[in-house]
Design a protein with these regions (language model features):
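AMP-forming adenylation/ATP pyrophosphatase catalytic core
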Residues: 16-52, 72-76, 108, 127, ...
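Core alpha/beta nucleotide-donor-binding catalytic domains of modification enzymes
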Residues: 19-224
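Alpha-helix boundary/capping and short turn/kink residues
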Residues: 162, 166, 188, 227-231, ...
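Mid-to-C-terminal catalytic subdomains of enzymes
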Residues: 198-235, 239-242, 246, 341, ...
């Protein structure tokens, strides 16, 4: 039951050996295809104590000899769940000690955070990012997170419901600078079966049972409904994300060329705001090439402009698309950043601090 702490150790058997080989083969192939690991790489597994992260730790231990990375682990105690959080920390400390994996534990105060009265998911995410920044600064090459194909499916459904474009539909990427996700090829059911088969305990986070969070409502409602229609629904959704990622990469390359061309083909007379932007060495883009581009390519180009400023949700990209089509006006993206169009060009105005 949720919150009780862990599952009992099961017996080993021939079925486990087959299961372990199958899962290790899937992760090995996925890691090779996406070039996740390198010899000598300093790899740190982010371990919460749940089934996914404990499966990640055990799988990385098994694959360590053939890939040659240096494996450590980290655990972030957010301080939000009282005794349950302390129980999870103690559990992870014990398991890493038993497995011989060096562990780094973080508390909010370690990275200058204080727990606010109503700390939510965004605060917890920022805390983890701050902890990972410390690891990277101390020499960790890559943090390995335990996101699975089930997480990928949930992410896709959540983004589609909120409104997303091709970039968002690509979901969680197998790797990005400083991070990798080796278990995107496995479902949550597979990580639990792997742990059960190899006798690996895990802790249960009781907040996963609460429907107070939108992602949990998807997990408890939408995904079971999709599985009833097709048992492979999670894998199929994750596979769609892979295709979306490839398409997004293709359009991103084309979008970069489009923006480069638009920076060159500027009219001779520019609005005062665009002149000022250029004096500050900020880019200015000709509207003509943008207006003539395929709508999908335009969206990809504008996504590249939005993403450094704020989360590139579909609504902000659509606002910029409308601005480009109209050829005049302004879109306020944040308190400090505004996009302007006029005089045949598009430019960015940033507030002076």
């Amino acid at each position: 039951a949720a919150g009780l702490g862990w599952r009992a150790y099961p017996l080993h058997g021939c079925g486990f050996q087959t299961l372990m080989k199958q899962i290790l083969k899937k992760v090995r192939t996925f890691a090779q295809e996406n070039e996740l690991f390198d010899p000598g790489q300093k790899l740190c597994a982010a371990v919460s104590g749940g089934a996914d992260s404990m499966a990640l730790l055990r799988i990385l231990l098994e694959l360590q000899p053939e890939f040659g990375y240096q494996l450590t682990a980290c655990h972030v105690n957010h301080g939000l769940r009282g005794a349950s959080a302390d129980r999870d920390e103690a559990f992870v400390r014990g398991e890493c000690g038993r497995l011989g994996v060096p562990l780094r534990v973080f508390h909010p105060a370690d990275v200058g955070f204080a727990v606010p009265p109503r700390a939510g998911e965004n605060w917890a995410r920022k805390l983890r990012c701050a902890c990972f920044d410390v690891l990277h600064a101390e020499g960790i090459t890559t943090v390995a997170a335990a996101h699975t194909a089930t997480d990928q499916a949930e992410t896709l459904l959540f983004r589609l419901a909120r409104g997303t474009g091709l970039h968002g539909a690509a979901g969680i990427r197998p790797k990005r600078e400083g991070f990798c996700h080796p278990l995107l090829c496995l479902t949550r059911g597979e990580t639990e079966r792997f742990c059960t088969g190899c006798g690996q305990r895990w802790v249960e986070d009781e907040t996963n049972d609460s429907d107070a969070y939108a992602r949990n409502r998807l997990r408890h409602g939408a995904l079971p409904a999709l599985r009833s229609a097709n048992a492979a629904a999670e894998e199929n959704l994750a596979r769609f994300c892979e295709k979306a990622a490839r398409a997004d990469a293709y359009f991103a390359q084309k979008a970069e060329v489009l923006l480069e061309d638009a920076e060159v083909l500027l009219p001779q007379r520019l609005p005062a705001g665009a002149v000022y932007a250029m004096q500050k060495e900020e880019p200015v883009w000709a509207l003509g090439p943008l207006q003539e581009a395929d709508p999908l390519l335009l969206e990809a180009a504008l996504h590249r402009l939005v993403s450094p400023v704020r989360d590139a949700e579909e609504k902000y990209v659509r606002l910029l698309c409308t601005l480009v089509e109209q050829g005049s006006g302004a879109v306020q993206l944040t308190e400090a950043v505004r996009f302007w169009a006029g005089g045949g060009v598009l430019w960015v105005e940033e507030a002076v601090e």
